[in-house]
Amino acid sequence: MFDVQREELIWGDRKLVLETGKTARQADGAVVATYGETTVLATVVAAKEPKAGIDFMPLTVNYQERAYAAGRIPGGYFKREGRPSEKETLVSRLIDRPIRPLFVEGWRNDTQVVVTVLSHDLENDPDIVSMVAASAALTLSGVPFMGPIGAARVGYLNGGYKLNPLVTEVAESTLDLVVAGTQDAVLMVESEAKELSEDVMLGAVMFGHKHFQPVIEAIIRLAEKAAKEPRDFSPPENADVEKAVLDICESELRDAYKITVKQDRYKAVDAVKAKVVAALCPAEGEQKFSPEKVKAAFKEAQSKVVRWNILDTGSRIDGRDVKTVRPIVSEVGVLPRAHGSSLFTRGETQALVVATLGTGEDEQFIDALEGTYKERFLLHYNFPPYSVGETGRMGSPGRREIGHGKLAWRAIRPVLPPAHEFPYTIRVVSEITESNGSSSMASVCGGSLSLMDAGVPLRRPVAGIAMGLILEGERFAVLSDILGDEDHLGDMDFKVAGTDEGITSLQMDIKIAGITEEIMRVALAQAKDGRAHILGEMAQALTAARPELGEYAPRIETMQIPTDKIRDVIGTGGKIIREIVEKTGAKINIEDTGVVKIASSDGKAIKAAYNWIRSIVAEPEAGTIYDGTIVKIMEFGAFVNFFGAKDGLVHISELAPQRVAKVGDVVKEGQKVKVKFLGADERGKIRLSMKVVDQETGEDITEKLKAERAERGEPEREERSDRGDRGDRGPRRDRGERRRESSGE
């Protein structure tokens, strides 16, 4: 029934198994990949006919995690998986980016790659396994895919590289890098690093490329046994139409691409395009070529004109040379009520970035396969259509916005202060108000400035720069701080962020079949120079965090209490903690370790809450005299609030030196008194005395009373440790039960 084919190999000290022929047999390609005990299913389905009227390759990648993979039931009301999580979106992009350039040019059939996590051992992250499985499924499917690709995660531990580190090892590593590529070249890099050098980063990329070669070889062996017949597809011949278009528009396109203002340049290019379409696709008469082919050829002509000009003259669209960064203006404190804000402008790219500080209550709960955890640093990136002078959809963030936000998050996170030094939840929001290339890196620069404006003590300022590439045969040019057109018409988008000490984040997307180590080395060196220049420009606004938090930011006071006192601070059903919050106005967060965080923008509120909690957890000293207030009168004595929130009992025998017949004859509720703390009994009940304290002066008169008794010839009274408990007895029926128990009934 099943024609199962398998390939196994030991990879990074663990077994990798690729299997096909048993699961999802109606898909064009299906592979189950298992690494350790993490298992994913990757499927590929491509439409039988091309999609009409489009000039792009319609590829969709969906990565989905199932809660059962980790033996969990989803949270929420419906108890089933819902919209994609942030991680699912990011891994979908991670799979998409290295495979998209490898489809044959002109492929217009809807193609969908679906990767489902079936089992997760909580040690091997499913993302690398998913990339490998997707590559294998595409290679088997028969679609025109020039793969396979391999992928690997690289860590940097104790001065050495680690292939596919476990989840626990990644947390300890100074590098988390994912690299993907073919046998010959690197296609994609995604990483977060703790200020590592360019040499270490490049070494990690090449280390990963070398060590995923056995995976590519295993996929090839599997394809030799199980691949389907290749689709009958030939790339369209467009040489004639491309020549006709270029003959008409080359000169005018060159002139249009000398216009430095983006909107004016776009108008000029659109005018040239309209002229070409009118010439080759007239409304009346014979059309030499279809409008779709002419428009596609015009796009190719745009690319050729821009690329030739850069390679031949070294001059770019806006007149810069390949290494020059656009003019930069950095401003901070631009929003009066925000905790921290900045407006970062680089050429025609602009980001308004705002930092907000919160308490532990504001941390984000993330429900992942590994379990639920809290995240204290959030970075959100918004790209409204007006930023490029267009109308468009508004609403929840798309994949691009989530991906760009995560890239900026990775760039800034390594320089944040640890939570025990700066116990705030931090949210950064980047509003892209203008865009002409590299808006994610503008978010990094603006985010760094806004955090320093808010008083967040970053280890060092962070800047980011986007590098581009023009590659024609043996000739290439690496471009610093690329424009949007250079991104669209070029071969690479290589983003590098870091401090003056090293790289914190690196992302590379290649639109061709890969780049060499030499090109990456040149790009990293050029990016380092550009990053240093940008940091210098940012320093004109701020060089370090402000010494004080923003005027409207909350202040947080941290205190440590004994863990056995947490219950006392919270109270029954949260009664006490709610009362503290309501009366002081402060926010309070108590951790299981006994760490208490008190937050408010009002210093007096923090002090009041701090003293209140301290009074609950602090212990009075035996023999010490305290001021107190009568809070309740009983037949057997009076309860006194005497030590912050602590109450204790003054037994009727301890109210006055003389015999007291009725408690109300001596004290009234609300009366201010002075009491001596006698201690606590074995049940923790607090015993107090008024009779041994001079209520006028607060003096301890114990010895004076002893002397008076001695003069009267009265015997010395022995202190009874349980006298304070006599009035705390239960109802008569309870006492009767105790007597019956003692008599053996």
From Swiss-Prot:
One of its GO terms (molecular function) is polyribonucleotide nucleotidyltransferase activity. Residues 623-691 form the S1 motif domain. Its cofactor is Mg(2+). It is found in: Cytoplasm. Mg(2+) binds at D487, D493. Its main location: cytoplasm. It catalyses: RNA(n+1) + phosphate = RNA(n) + a ribonucleoside 5'-diphosphate. Residues 554-613 form the KH domain. The keyword Cytoplasm applies. Gene3D superfamilies: GHMP Kinase, N-terminal domain (3.30.230.70), K Homology domain, type 1 (3.30.1370.10), Nucleic acid-binding proteins (2.40.50.140). GO terms for biological process: mRNA catabolic process; RNA processing. CDD domains: KH-I_PNPase, RNase_PH_PNPase_1, RNase_PH_PNPase_2, S1_PNPase. Belongs to the polyribonucleotide nucleotidyltransferase family. Involved in mRNA degradation. Catalyzes the phosphorolysis of single-stranded polyribonucleotides processively in the 3'- to 5'-direction. This is Polyribonucleotide nucleotidyltransferase. It comes from Methylorubrum populi (strain ATCC BAA-705 / NCIMB 13946 / BJ001). The lineage of its organism: Bacteria, Pseudomonadati, Pseudomonadota, Alphaproteobacteria, Hyphomicrobiales. The gene is pnp.
